[in-house]
Amino acid sequence: MMYSDVDETILRKNLKGLSVSNPSLGEKISQAVLDSRAAENASDAVSTSAPASNVPSTLTSSSSFEIKTSKTGLPVLVADGIALHSLMDPITESKRLLDGLKKEDEERVFLFFGAGLGYVVQETLKFKNVTAVWMEADPEILRYALSLFDYSELLESGKLRILLTPLLEQDLYAAFRGISGFPISFIPHRGSNHWKKDSYEELRFIAEGFFHKKDVNISTLTRFERIWTRNFISNLPELADMKPIVSLFGVCRGKTDILVCGAGPSLILSLDEIRIFRNNYILIAVDTALMVLWNAGIDPDLVFSVDPQALNTKYLEGYTGSARIVFDPTSSYHSLRLPGTFKNGFFTSSPFPLIRILSSKPEEEIGAIDFGGSVSTNAVSLAEKMEARNILLVGQDLSFPDKLAHCKGAVLEERLNHIESRKFRREYHNHKQMTALPVKRARSIRGGELRTNEKLLIFKKWFEDHPKKNPWFNFGKDGVVLEGIPGANFAEYIQKNECDPKTVRSVRDRILQIADEPAHARTAHKIENELKTLFEQLKGFSEKVTRGRILSERLYSQIRAEDKFKDQILKNLKEMDGIDEEVSSRKGLTEILGMSIQRTVLMITEGYEGGLTLEEKKNERLGIAKKSLLLYQGLEEACKLHSKQIGKAIARISDPKFET
């Protein structure tokens, strides 16, 4: 690593390297660094001709910086009088910081919260298996670091990745693309923490939150990939008789409140008030809360269902009220096969490419609901789209008040009556739910703190950060405080916010009228034709995929014993290129199949669940062959799954006994 005085040429070379590895992120950091330099130059120019008190605040820096020289002759950045590195020997200091960390056993990521001029980053990147991610809180620090040392090759190769506040979620995803599956070491920088402890601790909190959320997302993807596909295809015959959710958008016209009812433990405390004031609002219940409300004599207007698990159907069993379901196409297919008029409801759009079977313009013709990760966030988003006057929340505890994981009387609790045994008590089941994820604490509505977890805090953040077009109020009597959403007393709110019951009744009648409109026969016919076309396309495609899988297996074996099969490898590679080209050209099919092989995709791109063995990582050609094999194995399984489910759906929708 070459060192010179602060050099514009080196700075621009580094900024160019940033833009090569990640253009959008590179441009953002480049602009911030150049802006900080321009502000400093302008401040210097103004200060020579005006008193300090007259210098505009936008041009003055809140910190002062200078470069000193260590006893070993290396530059040391001093910020506000605090040296960010050892004034004796910055290199030795950096080596000591890395002592004890595993570096050579496998691919790893070292995540630095501040690095000063980057000595510790330079030492890290001497290890070939380590990728460094440098999170920085101040553009001035980066400007000095990138002007003193040439990091351009490391930046272009992706061995070094830099992040600068303010950080967006997509910045983090971009920086960790391809490496988030590797073991990650969090490394705070002593000098930076000594200078601005709060700023650099915040970087650590941001990183922790990002990885927790990413873990939750990956866990969900890999757990439900096949279930989502099966449910979506199996639901298609029933969806033909349902209405797109867009038909409810704007139905309230800003004249009627909507109460969104979650199934938190505190819901039981609000049942009497919900019943008393039932005629003053439209009621959307999440499916887990339905039977709690129904058994209390409360019938909602809409029931939102998004869970793909078969257990989800239990929440709807035995319901005979007049509410209509709002259904995500990937929800459990058993739900739409239950008896009852609630099924004559509405379906939402979906990010699944299969949604194009229902509409070529799903967001416009079906209607998109904002996904916050839970059924409650979806229900609130629907209330917004319906143009509620105010959005009222109840049962959104997002925590475990009174050491409970769910509302008393919920279906999940009632099912324990059937499976409870001496060794499996309901208290133990409740404890398992509370301890499934690491414990977190959050401020309680009742004062003090409540036990929660990272997953629930993700939903809490959605409620708090989601842009609010109309006022939101939290009627919950327990649970965490939702910052920015005022708490309210049910009775007092109703007194202060008069609502004509006739208007509410009119909206309720309109919802039922839309739901009960006869379905077009051509909808079912269109779905049947689309499925038959897709079924035929999969036949030819699966043959190519199977050939690709066989060839990938052969190539993998031949590359492992390369000396014996050199001529055959070249021949097979040529055939493999042709198959790759043909498979990749079928973008529509690969998009559809790709959603059901997310585990495989993550193994290839992120190293999820190990991905490659140490031997495959060391041998680049063997690693490529293994990734090819994993991909074709995944595609072959996906073809079989889709063909099987589509065949069943065609048989059902074309059967004269099937009534849409």
Q: Language-model features: where?
A:
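Active-site/ligand-binding-proximal alpha/beta "capping" segment
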Residues: H334-L398
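Glycine-rich phosphate/pyrophosphate-binding loops
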Residues: E136-A137, A289-L290, G297-D307, A383-C407
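N-terminal donor/sugar-recognition subdomains of glycan-related enzymes
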Residues: M1-C261, P265-I282, M291-N295, D299-P300, ...
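Generic beta-strand/beta-sheet core signal
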Residues: G262, V286, V306, D328, ...
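Short acidic, glycine/proline-enriched helix-loop-strand junctions
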Residues: Y151-L155, T320-R324, D402-H429, G448, ...
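Glycine-rich beta-alpha junction loops
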Residues: L168, D397-D402, G409, G476-V480
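Active-site gating loop/helix substructures
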Residues: K343-E364, E413-L450
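Extended, hydrophobic alpha-helical segments in both membrane/secreted and soluble proteins
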Residues: L283-A289, I325, A379, G395
